[in-house]
Amino acid sequence: MVVTRGDKFAGSSLACKSMIGANKMSGSHLHEVNNSRSHFPQTNWLKVAKAFECIPSLNKFMGSNFLYSLESQKLGRDREMAARSIENIAPVTVQTLARPQIEKAWCTLINLSINNTYLRPGITPAIDNDSTSRTSSTKGSTFKVTSNADGSFCAHNHPEHSQRSVRGTAKSIDSFSSSSVGDNKIIIDKVPRVNYEVRDSVTVTNGMEMPPIKNSAQLARPVEPREVSLGEIDYDDIMEIIDVDQIAMEHCPSTCTKQPSVSKFVDIFTSRREEEQGLPPEICSNCSHGIKLGLCPEASTHVEQMKDTLLAISNEILDNTYDLGPDHVEQLHQKRLLLKKQIQQLEILIHNKERKKSQCLVSIPSHNTQYETPQTTNLEVVYGQTDSPTHVKEQGRCVTDNWNMPRDYLVSKERYDISSGSEEREQSVSEVIDVTDTESSNDKKWTSSDFPWTKNLEVYNKLVFGNHSFRPNQREIINATMSGCDVFVLMPTGGGKSLTYQLPALLCAGITLVISPLVSLIQDQIMNLLQTNISAASLSAGMEWAEQLEILQELSSEKSKYKLLYVTPEKVAKSESLLRHLEILNSRSLLARFVIDEAHCVSQWGHDFRPDYQGLGVLKQKFPNIPMLALTATATTSVKEDVVQALGLVNCVVFRQSFNRPNLWYSVVPKTNKCLEDIDKFIRENHFDECGIIYCLSRMDCEKVTEALRVFGHKAAFYHGSMDPGKRAFVQKQWSKDEINIICATVAFGMGINKPDVRFVIHHSLPKSIEGYHQECGRAGRDGQRSSCVLYYSYTDYIRVKHMISQGGLGQGQMKMGYNCKASSGRMLETNTENLLRMVSYCENEVDCRRFLQLVHLGEKFDSTNCKNTCDNCSSSKILIDKDVTVIARQLVALVKLTGERFSSAHIVEIYRGSLNQSVKRNRQDTLHLHGAGKHLTKSEASRILHYLVTEDILAEGVKKSELYGSVSSLLKVNRSKAASLLSGGQSITMRFPSTIKVSKQSKSTANPAKVPLKQTTLPMAKAAPQDSNLSGILLTALKNLRTDIVKESPDLVMAYHIFGNATLKEISKRLPRTKEELLDINGLGKAKVSKYGDRLLETIDSTINDHYKTRPGSGKRRRDENVNPNVAEDDDPDWSASQSHKKVVKNKK
C-alpha cells in the first residue's frame, strides 16, 4: 500500500478503513453479517468509521470486531472456518526500533489526520480561511508499505508529493524493529500472514479514493520471506453492489429528486438520417469504406489521401501542360476543383467535431478537482493617477504592480479598446468558394487612359517617385486595383511591385493596409517612403504599447497623416484589437485596400509556407467589399490557385509577367574539395570589390566560408539565425552601407533586403527548391545591371539537405493544424522532398537551358533561343548525343536488390564500375555477377544515371546520421511499384551525354556574360552634354562619396539606395544636369529628393567640372541661379494646383 500525504483523505477514508479491517476479522460476528445481507451498507460505514476512530493502538484495532459492508466480503462455509481460526493466533510481539529516524518516519505515516465527514454527491467540502497560506506548502513524503511472505511489513519513504494539514484524529503505533542499519525500510517481524487474492498494489494519492480489495480473504501457510505488495482494489466491485442513488436519497431526501426507472433512448436511425441531410453535397459520396465521406470515422485519413491526389493532379497539369489535350486538361481542372471543395468541407466538419469534443472535455472536471471547489480570488483594478503604479485589490490586500501606464489610459482604453498583449483569436475556417480568375496581362481594358485618375497617376509617378514611365504591367495593375477589383500579381523580383500599391495609396482616400512577412522588409519600405515625404507607419509585436496607441489614434483622426500601415501576418492573426480598428475605419469609409506581399507564403505547397498567412482569409470574410492586392515573385500554378482560394479572391484579375531576368547569368559548377578557392577565384576575376551574397546550408558553413574569404582578403561577414539579433542587425547594416562587400548567410537572410547593386549570388550548397533558388537569385541585379548566379553542386549536399528536411530543420514553420497535425507534417515532408528532388534534377541536367528549366517549373513557357548564351548549358561548347540507358538502369536496380538495399549510391557506383576497395571486398561484393558491369562508364556518368533513378522515384533514398561521427549517409532502396515497369521491359530511359567531339571555344566575353555591360536606355537631354568618359567616371566617384556622407548624417535605418540608386548616379554622371529642373528629368529623382539634396548634387557637379576643366569657380552657381524657374514643376503638382485654386476662390469671395 502506498500512502501519500495530502489534504484529500476524506474521499478515501472509508475504503481505507474497510481494507484495514478486512485484514483481521472475528469469526463471532459472521452470523451478523449473514443476517444483514439484504441491507445497504451506508449504516455500516458510520459504525466502521466510529470504531476506527476510537482505536487507541494497532493491536486493539487488529483484534476488534468488523462489520461487513459488501456482498463479496461475506465468507463461504470453508472460508468461514479458516477465518475463525484467526482468533486463536497469539498476540504479536513488536520489537523496539533501532533507529529513531525510522521510528519518526513510521509515526509520520500513522499520524496522518483523516477527515471523516461524509459529503453527499454534488457537495464540495468547505475551505478554511487559512487555506491560502497552505496552498503552496513544502514538499511532503510518500510512504510505500509492502507485506513480506513472512508476515512482516516494509515502508519506503518517497519525498515527492506536496502535503497539507487536514483536521482529524491521530493514530499511532508504539514500537517497531529495524531491518538493517542505514536502511529506509521498516520491517515488522513475526506477524502471521493472511494471504488474499489481491492484485498488484494499492496507492492513495491526493484527492483520489482508494478502492476496496477485490476478492475475499484466504488463509495461507507462511512461506519464505519475499517482498510483495498489497493488492490493488477494484473500484467497480463496490459500484456493482452499492446503490449510490438510494444512499444519497436517504441522506438528503429533501434536496434530491428521484429519477425515473425507465431510460429514454434516442432513435439513432433518425439522428443519422438528419445528419446525412445536413451534409454538403460534395461529401455525400461514398468513400472506400462504403460510408458517406462526411460520416466516415476515418475522415482525416481521407483528407490526407485527397491532398496527395490533389498534389499529383497539380503536378500532372504543370509537367504536361503542352502535351495534354484541352479536354483532358479541363477534366483535370474539374477534378482538382472537386477535390478542393471536398477537402475544405471535410476539414470544416472535422474541425467542428474536434472543437465540440474539446469543449466537452473542458466542461468535465478532472478527477483531482471534481470533488473540490478551489478558492477564488476577486481582483479589482483601481486606476489612480496615470503616473502612479497600478493597485490590485485581492480580498482585502493591495498588490502594487510597477507598470508604466501611459497617460489618459481610461479614455484610451474605452475609446480605442487596445490591450497591451496579443489577443488570441480562434482560427477561422475558410469557407468553400467558387474561385474564378481572369488572365489580364494582355487585356487592353486596363491599359486605357480614360480612367479618371490617369492624369494624377502620371504626375504623382514623376513628381513623388521620380519615374518618367511605368514598367511592364504597373499601369494595368494600378488601374485594376483602383477600379475595386481583387488582383493577383505574379511579377519577378525587381519588377516594381511596391509602386503598384504605394501610388494608389497616395491617390485614394483612406488607409492602405500592407501585410509583409518580415519586420526588416517593413522598415526598409518605410525608410524608402520617408525619402519621398510619404508618411507610413507599422505595427508589430515588439513595439511599445503607447507607441501603438499613438499610431491607432492618428489613424482614427479626421485628417490622418498616414497613408500606408504595415503589419506582419502574425499581427493580423492574433490581434482582435487591430480588426476592431479596421472595422471602425471601414465604417467611416477610410479603409482603401489590403495588400498581401510575398503572397506565396499563404500556400502549403509554396516553398516558404507561413502558417499565420493562412489566417489572412479573415480579411475578406470581414471586409468583402475592400479590394485586395496579392503580390508574389515566385509561384507555381498550383500555388497561385491555392493562394487565391485561401484569401477568398472570388473574381480576381490575374497579371502574370515573365519571370525571366535577362540581366542574370546562371551556372552550376561541380563542388570539389577546393570549393572555397574556386569561389575566391570567381569573385576576383569577375566581381572584385563588388557586393554579393553567398548562401550556405548551416551556421557552421557560414562561419567557415567567411573565415576563408577574410584570409583571401575579402571584406566578408556571416549572418545566421543563431546570432544575437543586435549582431545580425549590425552585420546587415554594414553590408547595406557598403562597409563590407560579401555576406555569407543562411536562407533566413535576403527577403527583407532591397539592395539594388548586388552583383553576384553564390550558393555554396544545394537550395531546397527551384522556387527558393529562383527567389534567392532574384536578389542580384535589381538595378538592371549584369549579375552572376553560381551554384556549387555536390550530391553529398543533397544527402545533407534531405536529412535536415526529415528532421524538420528546413521546414517552413511549425504546423498549427489542430486535429491533423501529423498528417500535415507528413504532407509537408513529402512536398519538401519532392521539391528537393526537382532541384537535384536541375543541377544534374547538363543539357537544357537553365532559364527554361526554372521558368517551366514556374508555369511559364520559354524559348531557349532567347537565353542568348547567358547560362552555362547554352554557352557550352559540348556536342550532346542521346543514349539509351535502359539496360544500365535495370542493372543498377538489380544491384541495389542484390546488396540487400543497405548501401549508399556512391558504394553502388563503386561496385558497378568494378572497384576492389576494402569496403567492396569486406562485404564480398566483388563476387557478384554485376560487379564491374559498368566499367565502360565514367564515374560521373554512372552516378548521373543512378541519381536520375532517384529523382524519378524508381529508387528511394533513405538518410541516416552516424551517432558516433555525426556524418550523414544514404541507403538506396527499390521502389518496387515504380521499378516493376522498368524491369519488365515496359519502360525505356534515354538520356543526353556530352560527345567526345568538341567545337571551337567561343570568345571569353560570350562564355562569361557577367562581364558584358547591359545597354542602358536614357532619355535625351534638352541640351546635350559633351561626352567625356573621364569626367563621367570622376563625377560618379564624387557622387558616391556625397551619397556616403548623406547616409552617415541620416538615421541608422537609412541606406545608400534609399538616397540615390546607382543607376540614378550613373545617369547624372553621363547627362551632367546643371539646374534643379534638369535634375527632375533624371530617372529616380522626384520633387522631394530634389528639394532635399538638389543643392548638394549641383554643387558636387559644379566643383567636379571646375576641377576637371580648371574653370573659374562660381560660374556654375550664377548660371544655375539664372536658369532656375521659381515655379518649376509646381504647375503639374495636383496638391499645389488645388491650393492655388482654393486661394483664388477665397479671394473672389472677398
Swiss-Prot record:
Occurrences of domain HRDC (ranges): 1029-1111
Domain Helicase C-terminal: 678-823
Pfam families in the record: DEAD, Helicase_C, HRDC, RecQ_Zn_bind, RQC
Family matches, as Gene3D superfamilies: HRDC domain (1.10.150.80), P-loop containing nucleotide triphosphate hydrolases (3.40.50.300), Winged helix-like DNA-binding domain superfamily/Winged helix DNA-binding domain (1.10.10.10)
Lipid metabolism in keyword set: no
Chain intervals for the UniProt region annotation (Disordered): 124-143, 154-179, 416-446, 1106-1150
Cited InterPro entries: DEAD/DEAH_box_helicase_dom, DNA/RNA_helicase_DEAH_CS, DNA_helicase_ATP-dep_RecQ, Helicase_ATP-bd, Helicase_C-like, HRDC-like_sf, HRDC_dom, HRDC_dom_sf
Compositionally biased intervals (Low complexity): 132-142
Expression induction: Repressed by cold.
SUPFAM superfamilies per UniProt: HRDC-like, P-loop containing nucleoside triphosphate hydrolases
Record keyword Coiled coil present: yes
Domain Helicase ATP-binding: 478-653
Name of this protein: ATP-dependent DNA helicase Q-like 4B
EC number(s) per entry: 5.6.2.4
Coiled coil: 327-361
Highest taxon, organism lineage: Eukaryota
Enzyme category, top tier: isomerase
Keyword set, alphabetical order: ATP-binding, Coiled coil, DNA-binding, Helicase, Hydrolase, Isomerase, Magnesium, Manganese, Metal-binding, Nucleotide-binding, Nucleus
